[in-house]
Amino acid sequence: MIKTDALIIGAGPTGLFCAHQLGLIGLNCEIVDNLDKIGGQCIELYPDKPIYDIPAVPECTGEELTNNLIKQIKPFNIKFHLNERVEEVNKVNNKWIVKTNKKKEFVTPNIIIAGGVGSFEPRKFSPKECEKYENRSLFYSIKDKTIFQDKTISIFGGGDSALDWAIELSKSSYVNLIHRRDEFTGAQLSIDKIKELEKSGKLKIYTKYQLNSVKGEQNIKSIEIKHDDESLKELETNYVLGFFGLIMKLGPIVDWGLNLDKKTIPVNTENFETNLNGIFAIGDICTYPGKLKLILSGFHEGALAARGCFKYARPDEKLRFEFTTTSKAAQERLGVKK
């Protein structure tokens, strides 16, 4: 049985920064995530994709952001339990008893849900034969863009992910961009850019087409795409990428007694507590009036949720607000040497 001041469910940027905020105020925590690596969607979906809206960081990748957050929480010696999912949550004597699918048991006054409670699954191609090529020459997310260098890539989708990767991969590969509709739904700047790239011969756009079949032995050699008018076209290609969005499955969380709004958890905006005392929700999983699904917003939510945990972890103490620039206690916890 593992005792901790707070258990964070989700090892993405929001959960990592919340762990930092807990450490600053003297609370310990452990982190559980059903993914096999730290970083959440940042690492799983766009480790190499640039992020432009982190304060004071003009540009960084999901991997760089994750690595910096890990470095930031290093002084607190936080233990991670990866590739593990929370299955049961029960309250006994003002403590939450949390059990995972690997039979671990945590006792804590606080649970912070920062994602990691369910799973994100990509919407997939319809043709059944696509399954045999998955993670070899057909992908729904990109973890290492270098494998596509000097290859022909066929990208399916019309949203931001498809457009962004078409632009990025066209720098070192030839790209076919295929969309089932006549118009793209991504940012206008990206739409303008792909049209420029087509004019320069860097990529080819096919609209009103969908994947009809895939050909190849171990790896894909060519694909057949079908137009709305039923005409067929065959394209030679080395890799196929599909960006049709994600389906989120909440998993066991639906049985925990939380109020749910579709696939999100309503919270207050004072400390992002749910309808259950001692359970907080931050990041994309939570909802409230004016909610923005930004990493920046998740950092704010994590900071306030951490302070909300203090009253349950230290009921006989009063939390004083202090700046890290002047707080000796915070600096000692961070290992600052003077």
Swiss-Prot record:
Listed GO MF terms: ferredoxin-NADP+ reductase activity; flavin adenine dinucleotide binding; NADP binding
Record's cofactor remark: Binds 1 FAD per subunit.
Subunit details: Homodimer.
Name of the protein in question: Ferredoxin--NADP reductase
InterPro entries: FAD/NAD-bd_sf, Fd--NADP_Rdtase_type_2, Ferredoxin-NADP_redctase_2
Statement: the UniProt record of this protein carries the keyword Phosphoprotein: no
EC top class, as a word: oxidoreductase
Annotated organism of origin: Pelagibacter ubique (strain HTCC1062)
